Amino acid sequence: MARLKDKFSNEIAPALQQKFNYKNVMQIPKLEKVVINVGVGEAIQNSKAIDAAVGDLSKITGQKPVVTRAKKSIAAFKLRTGMPIGTKVTLRGDRMYEFVDRLMNVALPRVRDFHGVSDKAFDGRGNYTLGIKEQLIFPEIEYDKIDKVRGMDIIFVTTAKTDEEARELLGMLGMPFRK
C-alpha cells in the first residue's frame, strides 16, 4: 500500500471528518485522480518532439501517456484537425498516491527559489491545478538526455465540494502552500 494512501486512511480522513463535522464517511473529500498534461506546441513542425514528451512523461509517471490531438484546424498556427499537439496521463489508485508523494517530497523541493505553491489555483469545485515550468525537477529525468525543457500542468481532482475542503485535504497530504 502506498505510504500516502495509508496516511490518508489512518490520519487525514478522521481529521477531516472531525473538522468539517461529516456524519457519513462517504462525505469525506478524497483525491480521485491526478491528470498530468504536457502541451507540445512544436510538434507541428517537429514530429519527434511528441515522442520525447511521451518518453519523459512515462518515466515520470510509470504509465504510458495518451497522445492528445487537435480538435479543430487553426490556419494561423498551421494546425490541422487530428495533428498530435500534446500528451497526458491520468493516474488513479496507488500509482496516483505514489506520484503525489514523490511530487511533494522530492520534486517540488528541487525547484529553484521555491517558496510554496499558490493557493489561488482552485477552480471553485474543489479541484487544484499546478503548473510546472520544467520536467527536470523529477529525479527520473536525466539532464543530459533531454532535448528541450518542457513544462506541464498537474491537475488534482478531488471529491471535495468546496475549495476550502480541497485546500485542507491537499494541505494535510503535504502540499506546500505559500504562507
UniProtKB/Swiss-Prot annotation:
Pfam (any one): Ribosomal_L5_C
Keywords: Ribonucleoprotein, Ribosomal protein, RNA-binding, rRNA-binding, tRNA-binding
Domain of life, source organism: Bacteria
Keyword Manganese: no
Gene Ontology MF: a single term: structural constituent of ribosome
Keyword rRNA-binding tagged: yes
GO cellular component, one term: ribosome
One of the protein's GO biological processes: translation
Signal peptide: none
Family recorded in the similarity comment: Belongs to the universal ribosomal protein uL5 family.
Biological role: This is one of the proteins that bind and probably mediate the attachment of the 5S RNA into the large ribosomal subunit, where it forms part of the central protuberance. In the 70S ribosome it contacts protein S13 of the 30S subunit (bridge B1b), connecting the 2 subunits; this bridge is implicated in subunit movement. Contacts the P site tRNA; the 5S rRNA and some of its associated proteins might help stabilize positioning of ribosome-bound tRNAs.
Subunit: Part of the 50S ribosomal subunit; part of the 5S rRNA/L5/L18/L25 subcomplex. Contacts the 5S rRNA and the P site tRNA. Forms a bridge to the 30S subunit in the 70S ribosome.
Protein name per the record: Large ribosomal subunit protein uL5
Species whose genome carries this gene: Desulfitobacterium hafniense (strain Y51)
